[in-house]
Amino acid sequence: MPSTLLSDRSGFTPMIARLIGMMTYTRETTLEAVQGWTPEELDLIPDGHANSAGMLLAHMAAVERIYQLISDGHPDPDGALEAHHWPGLNLGQQGRAEIRGRPLRHYLEALAQVRAGTLALLAARDDAWLDEPLPLWGDTGNRHFMWFHVFEDEINHRGQLRLLRRHQPGHQGLGTTGAWLEPLRDGLGVRCRMVHKGSPAEQAGLRGGDEIVAIDGVDVQAAYFHELRLGAAPCVSSTYRVRRASGELDLTVTRVARPG
């Protein structure tokens, strides 16, 4: 569950900390939209759509990277933008031709690498830098608006990802366990953040804070969380191997239909 508290963050000035909170929430919900997608699903461009999910993820990374350069005052951001980001920035025919056949991990790593650069940049700046007036789009803007625009653009494309999901049969009609799972650390592993009262997960004994080391016999300790295909139809069971201070135990949870 993404954090909904916009507050101070260690290593960042107050306004920048809250900006990062909004960017982080946006990114987490973006990755939820493509949880467990295969390369074929990431490449699909249904009728009426201009971009694949992979193209949109590459675009998010490219937009964030070029705004790093712009907000840091680079004299030639276009010239400095790395060649591998141009297909994602341009999309169109170039994007359709070049952004194909890649696993979800490729996009996860690209997004994480760019985000690490953004956090390093923002950690070295302060709120006065964020608010400083400067020319933008033929008018006067500031870096606060630039970084707002970065995650505003991502939110728009997240909506497109959710529309693309409707064209993926394997992601329709999924049941729920009532457990909210999340990465354990740095995008890797699986942790149960919370369990809804009365849900199948609670009835099976799963608890918030449990570290999940295997799902259906597959070790997930070093897995990229968002690569894992966690969904399944109602009545389908999964066995979670849980690690607690007292040791490890297996808990079997059977999904139910989602409310409504």
Where are these regions (language model features)?
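PDZ/PDZ-like domain segments forming the peptide/carboxylate-binding groove
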Residues: L174-A214, V218-Q221
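PDZ domains, with a preference for the canonical peptide-binding region formed by the helix
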Residues: E202, G208, A214-G247
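Short, cationic motifs built from Arg/Lys/His that form the positively charged side of catalytic pockets
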Residues: R27, R115, V242-R244
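PDZ/PDZ-like peptide-tail recognition elements
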Residues: G170-M194, G231, T239-R241, D250-G260
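Acidic/histidine-rich alpha-helical segments that form the ligand environment
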Residues: N90-D131, H144-V150
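Short, contiguous alpha-helical
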Residues: P2-R9, I16, I20-V34, P39-L91, ...
